[in-house]
């Protein structure tokens, strides 16, 4: 059985990945993992000619991650696509962020994709792909989103390392670096209307971002940064000392 796995699939970018995954990969089933079962069922019903399996799970919970991993190890599917999309981000001064929110960001943004990817790799054949959703926040430190940008820098490093490590096996790894999108992420994280930087940035289209990431991953590419302005920022962050970048990246 050939499958794809998408986390954070209930809305936004994850939903777009789910809607387009079958166009780029030969899949028998798509496994959807997210907290909201009703939203995933609605998504599955919008694709009546496709087979979707729903895993209601909160990736902040290690037991939920283990449930998904157990399904992989029990059924031993051929995993053609893994999209580590689920993520959390909160905006505030570092000492004001609730401890539980910091823990949640670390668990969802780092622990979950690390453990899920490690479990999936043994079942990925040549030609399979892993997509990690990072962020433009990975390019330079973001004051007032210190933990979030650190988790995304971790994902950037993990994706680059695994791309090199898995290349001999023919498994491609791509990191996607989107800028802010008009999704629930901005409201859930208390970002919308509270950040002079985010409020001024152009918005990334989730549909186009997912399509480009899937297409580039299928072609063996290693990264995608939507929008020309964000590509320039990525270059700027590479060549400019971060103490000069941070006044621009401060959220």
Could you say what each language-model-derived stretch is?
Residues 10-11:
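Conserved glycine-rich cofactor-binding loop
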Residues 24-42:
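Conserved glycine-rich Rossmann-like NAD(P)H-binding loop of the short-chain dehydrogenase/reductase
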Residues 85-90:
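Conserved NAD(P)H cofactor-binding loop of Rossmann-fold oxidoreductase domains
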Residues 93-94, 101-104:
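Substrate-binding pocket helix/loop in short-chain dehydrogenase/reductase
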Residues 117, 151:
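Active-site helix of classical SDR
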Residues 135:
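Residue(s) in the substrate-gating loop at a strand-loop-helix junction
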Residues 175, 196-233:
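C-terminal helical subdomain
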């Amino acid at each position: 059985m050939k499958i794809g796995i998408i986390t954070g699939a209930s809305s936004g970018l994850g939903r777009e990945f789910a809607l387009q995954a079958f166009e780029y990969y030969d899949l028998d089933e798509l496994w959807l993992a997210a907290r909201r079962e009703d939203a995933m069922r609605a998504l599955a019903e919008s694709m009546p000619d496709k087979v979707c399996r729903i895993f209601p799970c909160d990736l902040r919970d290690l037991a939920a991650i283990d449930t998904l991993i157990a399904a992989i190890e029990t059924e031993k599917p051929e995993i053609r696509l893994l999209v580590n999309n689920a993520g959390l981000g909160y905006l505030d001064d570092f000492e004001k962020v609730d401890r539980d929110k910091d823990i949640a960001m670390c668990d969802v943004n780092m622990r979950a994709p690390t453990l899920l990817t490690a479990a999936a790799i043994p079942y990925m054949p040549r030609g399979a792909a892993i997509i990690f959703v990072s962020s433009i926040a990975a390019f330079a430190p973001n004051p007032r989103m210190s933990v979030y940008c650190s988790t995304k820098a971790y994902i950037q490093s993990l994706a680059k390392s695994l791309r090199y490590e898995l290349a001999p096996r023919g498994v491609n790894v791509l990191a996607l670096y989107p800028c802010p999108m008009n999704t629930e992420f901005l409201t859930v994280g208390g970002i919308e209307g509270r950040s002079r930087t985010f409020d001024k940035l152009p918005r990334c289209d989730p549909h186009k971002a997912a399509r480009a990431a899937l297409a580039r991953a299928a072609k063996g590419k290693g990264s995608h940064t939507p929008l020309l302005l964000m590509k320039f920022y990525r270059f700027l962050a590479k060549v400019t000392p971060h103490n000069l970048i941070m006044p621009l990246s401060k959220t």
